[in-house]
Amino acid sequence: MDNNKKDFKPYIPADKVVPEFTVTALLIGILLAIVFGAANAYLGLLVGMTVSASIPAAVISMGIIRVILRKDSILENNMVQTIGSAGESVAAGAIFTLPALFLWAEEGKIDFPSILTIFLIALFGGILGVCFMVPLRQALIVEEHGILPFPEGTACAEVLLAGEEGGSKAGTVFAGLGIAAVYKFLADGTMLFKSEIGHAFESYKGSQVGIQVLPALAGVGYICGPKISSYMFAGGTLSWFVLMPMIALFGADATIFPASKTVTELLTMEGGGPSALWSNYIKYIGAGAVATGGIISLIKSLPLIVRTFKQAIGSMRSKNGAHKGLRTEQDLSIPVLIVIALVIAVLIWLIPTFPVNLVGALIIVVFGFFFATVSSRMVGLIGSSNNPVSGMTIATLLFATVILKATGTTGITGMVGAISIGGIICIVAAIAGDASQDLKTGFIVGATPKKQQIGEIVGVVASAAAIGFVLYLLNEAWGYGTEKIPAAQATMMKMLVEGIMNGELPWALIFIGVFIAIVVEILHMPVMPFAVGMYLPFSLSAGIMAGGVVRILVEKKKGTEKEKKARTDRGLLFTSGMIAGEGIIGILLAILAVLKIDSKIILPFQLPQIGSLILFIALLALLYKVCMKADKE
C-alpha cells in the first residue's frame, strides 16, 4: 500500500464505476447497524466500553455477498461496513449519557424519556457528526495521506483488499457469534449454569472474589489486550480487596452518607453483603475516578486538540477545488450540509419534546463542530480506541450545566437539558471519528466519498431508530446502575450534573476517587481503564482479565511475525463474533424478561459453581485453539 500522497492510486480507479450504493449493501448494512448497535449498547452498559464494528461488518459482508450471493464488489462491502459501523458509534454516544434520564425517572424526578426523544437525540447527534466531518475529508484523508495513519480505517481496507479470504474469515466471525449465543442462552436463559460465581470472605469482611463467565467479557479482554485488561483488573482489586474491607473495618458501626444503615447492617441484611457496599459507596468513588480520568485524558490531549483544530481549519481554507469532477473526490455539498446543521439547531430549540433551550442549541453547534473536528483528526493520529470522547463529553457537560444554571435553567430541567446536550455531543464526536475511519478505508479502496457519506447517514438513521427500544428493554429488564447493568459512564455523568446543580452528593467519596485517579496518573498508568475497573463489579473485571490472559498466551506462542499476526487477527474476528452473539441473546433475554415469560425456559436443575468455571475454561481453550488454527491456513 503506497503511503506517498502524490503517487497514491486507489484500488478501484476513479474512472472505473463498480456496484457500490446498492440495495444489497443497504439492506445488509442497515441490518448490521442495528445488530452491532444493539450488541454494543448491551456491552457498553455492562463493561463501560464498546468495540469497533468496521472489520467484523466488512468480513460478514464479504461472506454474504461473495460466498452466498456469488457477487464480488469491494465497494459494496465497503458500503456495508460504513453503514454497519455507524450503529456502534451511535450506541456508544447514547449509552454513555442517556441512561441518566432513566435513572432520574426511576427516582420519580421526571417522566421516562419517550422513544421519540431518544431517537431525535441520536439522529441529530449522528447527522451533525457527519455534517461537521465532511468538510474535513479533503484535508485529513487526502492531503495528509501517509501522515495520519488512521489505524482502524487502514486495517479495514487491508481486510477488504484481502477479500479472497472473505469466506473463511466470515466463517470465523459467525462461529464466534453462534457459540457465544448458545453459551449465553444456556447460562442466563435456561439457567443451566451460573453466569457469575463468587465467594465472600467472612474473615475479611467487605471483600468478595468472583468472575462472570461470559463470552463477551472474554472477547473484550482479548480485543483490548493484556495491558488494558490488567489495568481494569487492578482497579477492581483496589475497590473490592482494599477500599471495601477498609470501609467494613473502620466504619462498622457508622452510618455513612448516602447509605441510611450502618455498614454492619449493610453487610448482614438480606440482599446485602459486599454488593451493598459497592452500590452505596464504591460507585461514587469509582465515578469520581472515571470523571477525573476523562478530564486528565482531555487535558493531556489539549496541545494536540488545539494544533489539530488549527491545522484542520487552515487546511479547509487553503484547499483548492481540483479534481472535484473525479468520482473519488465527490463530497456532499458543503453549503447544503451547513443548512442541514442550522436547521437541526433550530429544531433542537423549537421541538417541544426536546429538553433543550436556545442556549443549549447554540452550545451544541459550537461544541459539536469543535469536538467533531478534534475527533476526526485524533482518530487519524491515535486510533478510535484512544479517542477521548468521554473527556469531551465531560467538558461539554461541565460547561453546559454551568451556563444553563447561570441563565436560569436550574433544577431537574437544567439537569435533563445538560444530559441531552452531552448526549448529542458524545454522538457527534463518536460519529465524526467513525466517519473519518470509514472514509479513509474508502479512500484506499477507491470508494465514492459522497455515497459513503450518505451511507453513514443511513446507518445513523437505522441505529437511532433502534437505540431507544434497546435502552428501554435493558432498563425494564434489569435496571441501570445495578450490578447487572452498571452503566458506569452514564451514572457518572448523572452525578456530575447533579453535583453542579444542587450539590447533593457524597463529595468525600467522590474526592477519594478523584485523588486515586491522580495517584494512578502520577504512576504513569492509564487512568480511564483503571477507573472503570474501580467502578465495575469485580466479577466483570475478572472475566475481562481472563480474555487478556488468552491474548498473552497467543502472543507468546513461537512463530514468525506473519504467523503471530495471523493468530491474533483470527482471534479478533472470533471474539468480535462472540461479543455480537452475546449482545443479541442479551437483547432477546431482555425481551423475554419484559414479557414476563423468561421463567418458562428455565431448566429444573443447575450445575454447581465448579461447572460454570469448567465451561468458561473450555470456552477460553476454544478461543486459543481458534487462534492457533491460523497456522494451518
Residue ranges and their predicted role:
Residues 1-633:
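Alpha-helical multipass membrane-protein architecture
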